[in-house]
Amino acid sequence: MDPEALNLEFYDKNGLDNPIHFRCDPKRIGMTLPSPDFSVDDVLELVGGNRMIEVVQVQNQGSVKMSLQEFINFYKTPQEKREVLYNVLSLEFSQTPLEDLVKSPELVRQIDWVGNQWPDALRQRWISFNGRDKKFYNPHHTFPKVQNYCLMSVANCYTDFHIDFSGTSVWYHVLKGRKVFWLIPPTETNFFIYQEFIKTVNDNAFFGKSVEKCHVAILEPGDTMLIPSGWIHAVYTPDDSLVFGGNFLHSQSCKTQLRVYQVENKLNITRKFRLPYNEELIFYVIADYVKQWTGREYVRPLRIEDAKYDYVGDKWKTAGGHHKKIEYSDYETGVELTNDMIKGDEESTKDEVKVIAMHAENSLFGYPMVSKATFSADTGLEEEADEDEVKYQETKEEMDARRDAEIDELANSNSLIFYKNRTHDFVRNKCVPDHKLPIGHEPPIYFNDDEISRISPRLLDELETLGTYIRRKARVEVAEGICQPASLINTFQTVLKKRRSELTGKKFEFNQIMPRRYTRSTMETGEYDFQPTQEVPQESARRSTRFKVDNFPDELLESEVTDKPIILPQQPSSGPLEYLPAPKDEIKEDINGFEEEFEEEYEGIGQRDDQEEEEYDAEEPEDQEEEEEDEYQAEEYTPTPVTRRSSSRRSGAKNDESEEVSVKKDKKEKMEKVEKDEKRRNSKSKKDKISKEKKKKERERIELESQLDAELRAAHGGGSSKSKKKKPEKPAFVGGLPTSSIQIDPVVSNPYNYDPRMEMMKLGTGQLKSAYRKTKNNVELHIEKNLYKIEPKRGSEEGSQSREQSMEPEHSTPVFTTFDDINEANNDHYDGQKPPTKRAKYEAISVDTYETPSSSRNKEHKEYRPSPNAAPTPSPSHHQKPKLSSPAMVSSTNEYQLRKHMSSERRSSDAGSAMKKGVYMPAMSRQDKMIAEGASAPSSRHSSISSERRPSFIPDFNSSRNSSIDTPYTPTTVTPSRSSWLPNTSSINRHSIEDDSPIDVVNDSLSPINIASSPTYPTAITPPPVTLSDLKKDMSNGRKSHSQHHDDGHKHKIPSKEAIAELKLLVGKLKAINDS
C-alpha cells in the first residue's frame, strides 16, 4: 500500500487485520529513526551500561539477567567465539535520551490506548539498586510501558512461535541486519492448535507445519512492518541485527485482544509475561469514550503531587528529566519502599535497596505553592521555597481537605461530574465486583450525536464486545480515580445500544432507572429523587400548595401547612415518574373528609417512623420494587402531627372555617398526648440506661478483682483460682463402685530424684527422656575411681588411636540359635536391637555376678542363654552347614551355674538390680565390673549363644598361625560366633569396636580339638591352644587388641589361676559390703 495512505481514514475503514510491510523511507509513515551509522555502542551510551536487562538464552528459550554493558561486550565478540547465544527482546528505552531519536509511526501514536488514555499523573516509577556498590539499577513502572523497545540479536538467534502479550499489535523496523518472520493468521482453528502446542513443552516440531497457512516475510535493513493483534509468529536472525519496535493496543481489535487475554488465562501465563494493568487501561478507555459521547466525567483529575512514586510524565520529559543518568548517589537519601508498598506491581527479583527519586525537577510542574513538608512526608521530594515569594504554606492535610471540598462542590453543582474525592478510590491491584452493583436514579444522559455518528459498524462491534466482557466478568481491577464503575459501564452500553438502533433503523427506547416507586410516606418526608416545581405562597391565601394541581392526580395528598421547607436535590430528573396512588376503597374518610385516625396507633409511632427512615435511606434495586410496593400497601396508614386530606381540585373552596377550628383542637389534644408518651418513654429509657451502667460497672469490678487475684497467685506461685463456695466431698463412682481419687501432684517433694519406674524399665532402652534419668549428678556417688585402674582414661591419645585402628565393617547376625532362642525371639516383649545411647563417663557395676561381660554396643540388649536340655537348632539359612559357637571352654559346673541363673525374662538394669536387693550401688569403672563378673565364671570364655544379635567374627584364612601344634589350623566350617573380648590371634580378626576389656585371661592347659571329627552341631568347640608366647608374637607383629589403652599398646597378661583368685577376693569384698 502507499505509505501516505496509512492514516486514520484508512484505519477507521479497514482496521489493522493483516500485516503491512513497508520498504520505503520511514519518514513517509511518520517515523523518526537515527542514522544508519547508529550502533549498539550508541545504545549503551544513551541508555546506560548499569541498566539491568533480561536476556533470552536461545538454546533453551530461558532468561538470564545481566547488565547492558555485559551484553554489549558479548554482542561485540566474534561469532566463532560465542559459546552461547543471547537475544535482547525486552529493553524498553522510554524515559531515556534514546526516546528522542526513535518514534513509532504516526498512526500508531494516534490510536495507542496507553499513550492517549492513560492519565499523565499516573505515569510513575520506582528504582531498585543492586550489586555490592549499588552500581546496577532496574526501573519499575506503574503503567503499561511497552511502547518502545530496542531489540539486539546476534546471528542464528531464533524466537519460537508466540503471540505478543494480551494480543498487542507490533510495529517493527530493522535498522541493521536481517529478520525472517513466519506469520500465522489468528483463526479459531489456529488458536486451538496453538494452545495445544504451548502445553507440550517437549515438542520440538516446527509449529508452522501444523497449520493450514504459514506466511514468510523477510525484512531487510530499513524495512518496517506492522503485525496485527493475535498473529502467531516466529523470528529468525541470520545476521547480527539492531531493531526498534513496540507494542500497542487499539479499539479496532478488541475482539482479538480479549480472546488472547482469555487464552493467557487458560494457559496460566505468569504476570511477568503479560501486559501489566490491562483491566485498568480498559476502564480508562471506556471512560474516555463516555466523555466524548455524553460529556460525563468518571475519572477524577489526578494531581502530580499525589504521586506515590517518582512522576515521569509529559511535564517531566519537557523539563528534561529523561536526560539525567540514574546513579545511586542521587537516590541514597531516598525513601526505602517496603514490600507492602510495591506488592502486586511488576514482579522482580529481591533487590537490596528500593527507593523513590529525590530530585525536585522530577515532580511538581506548575504547583509552586505546595510546601516542602508535603514532599518529605508524601513523595520524599525536596524543594527550597523562597521566603519572599511564599509567606504561608498549607500543610498536607489542609491541602487534601481543600481539594476534596472542591471536588464535592463541583460534583454537587454539575450533573455531568460522576467522580468523587480521593476517599472513594479503590485499592490498587484489588479485584472488586463493584461494576455489578445496581444503579440508582441518575440525571438524564445527554447524547452528543456528532460524536456518536462517527462510530462505524466495525468499531461498534468491537466496542460492544469490550463492554460485554467487562460486564460479565465477576471481579475486575478498577482503575484509580474511577468511583462509579457500574454507572460508567451502563452509560457506555446505553450509547452503543442507541448507535445500534440508529444503524438498524429501529426506535431507541431508553428507560431511566428509578431507585423505587413513590408512596405517601415519600411525599410526606420530602425524600424526592426529582425536583418538582414550586410556587411562592401568597399571604392572603388560606392554604399554600407546593405543587401545581394539574401535574398530579386527584388521589395524591397535599399538605395543609408547610412547617419546614423541604430540601430538594439539585439534579433534574429524566424519564416519566411512576406513582402508585392508593385506591379509594382503602382510604376511609370521616364526615369531615379526613382519614380516620385511631389513638392506639400512637403507641408505636416512634418505631414505625424509625422503620420508614431505615427503609428509605438505603436504595433498593429494581427487582425489589414490586415487593416494596406490597409492603407499603399492607401497612396501615399512620397519620403524622400535620394532617393531610385527599386532594381535589375544588376541595379547598368548599370547607368552612369551623372545620379548621375543630381540626386545630384535635391537633392540640393529640400533640399533648404524643408529648406525654415521649416523656414517659424518655424516663423509662433513662432508668434502663442507669441500670445498664450499674451492671457494667459491677462487671468491670469483678473482672478487675479476678485479674488481681490471678496476678497475685502467679506472683506467689499459686495454682489456679478456686471457687469460694466449698462443695461437699462425695465419693467418686465408676461402674457402681467407689474409687479413690487419682492424685496428680506428688504428696511431698522429691529432692533425691528418686523414681520407682527405674525398677521397671532399664534406662537407655528407648524410653522417653525425663527429669529422673540417671546421670552422674543425681544418682552416682563419686568414689575413688582409681581403684584397680590398669588403663588410661577414655579419650586419651593412645585410646583414640586404638579405636581408630579397630574400625571395621558392620557385624553379621549370629550363625545359629537354639530352640529357646527362637521362642524368646517370638515373645511380645522382645524389643529387638536398639541404637546405642550416649556412653556415660563412668559405668555402674552390676551385682549380678553371673552376668557375662559384653561389649558396650550390646549392653542395652536382652541376652538369652540356651537351655541345657535342648539341642541347638540350626538357623534356617544355614541348615546344611555346621555351626560353631564361641570358642570357649564350658565345664559342666559352669553350665549348671548358668542354667541356674538364666531365664527368658528381660533383665533389669544394673541400678535396678541393686535396688531390688536393697543396696545402693555406686558407679564403678568398667574393669571393676568385669573383675566382679569374672569371679562367677572360672572359664571366662564361655559361649554367649543367645537371641541377641551379636557380631560374628570371620577368621583370617590368608594369615599363618604360629602355634605349638605342628598341623596348622584350617577352619572348614562357618565362622564361629565368639565373644568380642577374647584375645587376638593370627587366625581370627577382631571386629568389635566398643569393647574395652582390660584383662585377657588365657588358659594355658587347652588341648587341640579335631574339628573334622567333631559333631555336626557341637555345643562348644575350642580352637587349638594358644600360649602366652604365641600372643607375644602376635602382638609384636603389629596386631594390637582394640581394647588396649596403655602407653606401649600391650596388655599385662597374668595366668588364669592368679586372675581367678583375685576375682574371688573382690567378690567376697562385695558380698561383705552388701551384707553390711
UniProtKB/Swiss-Prot annotation:
Broad class of the protein's primary localization: nucleus
GO biological process, one term: regulation of transcription by RNA polymerase II
Gene Ontology molecular function: any one: metal ion binding
Residue segments, region Disordered: 598-748, 789-1056
Ranges of Acidic residues composition bias in the record: 610-634
Binding site for Fe cation: H162, D164, H233
Keyword Secreted: no
Family membership: Belongs to the JHDM1 histone demethylase family.
Protein name as it appears in the record: JmjC domain-containing histone demethylation protein 1
